[in-house]
Amino acid sequence: IIVSLVGSEMCIRDRSWVDYIDVPDPVITKGSDVIVRIGGAGVCRTDLHVIEGIWRPHMDPSGNALLPLILGHENAGWVEDVGPEVEGLKKGDPVIIHPKISNGTCIACRRGQDMHGEGTFPGLDSDGGYAEALVTSERNIIKLPKSLLPKEVAPYSDAGLTAYRAAKKATRHLLPGEYCVVIGAGGLGHIAIQVLRAMCAAEIIVIDTSDASLALAGECGADHLVKADGGEVDAILALTKGHGAEAVLDFVGENGTTRKGLAMTRSAGSYYVVGYGEDIQVPTVDLVITEKNIIGNLVGTWAELTELMELAHRGLVDLTTKEYALKDANLALRDLHEGKIRGRAVLIP
């Protein structure tokens, strides 16, 4: 499944965003290469942003030189082949793939910050997993236990990992009796709620515009459900005795949620930005007086993905998915664009 144009009005209007074509099979070119037969590829809103052209400055500042591109950065499957330097992996091993192929030697990699390391990001700047097979690196592979199937966990590799990292940051300072707000109970938010429930004893408040998403949030362990109808800031202040929440995790990042999210963050609290789409407008004097922290979140580390897989293996985190055939990628992308997916969509070759 490839995208040939980005930011094309015709492409976006017609909603025939990607093409289903035959391409050569990936091959081993490095000793550390691993070819994975895809068992599931998560459909992410970032894929829509790639099609819309939002990621073009980050993918390829010079133009469309990287196109056509195979999308897909949330991938899991089975080992198909390995390079001569790879040890501990064999054909047929079920695996999940960390999305960033970092080189392992730059300063970010040495510090364990895999997502900031030098390298490539399949699905964004090189061919990804909307395909039958994908070439990655031994560094990116995590073996799956028998309890987890590739198609069930593929979206964890980015969506789940991003949600886990943000929630993990919050749980480091959340104490029993404190409050954590989750804005958006969709594909990422419903994972974060479960991570928070598994890792801390704070009260979890979830905000969403959708009754269906709020119902899912309740199933995932939220203590309080708030409809986003314009009065959500007042509702949060009422629930927190007028103080606001110690942590706010914003999985939307647009349509006014940044302003509201900061307004419902307690003084000295932390506002975690995960979703994106608008600018954060805040007077600097307000940050000085309230000492609120604004914290960005990008994917997560290889080690954090192993931690998330442990939670999934123990049944503490469960991913709600909807499956589509690989050839129906346009339908999956359209359903995501129109808000018809509960949880995450997964493409099955």
Region spans (language model):
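Single conserved hydrophobic/aromatic residue that forms the stacking wall/gate
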Residues: 1-7, 12
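Glycine-rich cofactor phosphate-binding loops and adjacent beta1-alpha1 units
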Residues: 171-176, 214-293
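Glycine-rich beta-strand-centered segment in the early N-terminal region that forms part
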Residues: 26-41, 56-107, 140, 145-148
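Mid-domain Rossmann-like dinucleotide-binding core that forms the NAD(H)/NADP(H) cofactor-binding site
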Residues: 139-141, 146-230, 235
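Rossmann-fold dehydrogenase core element
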Residues: 270-272, 282-322
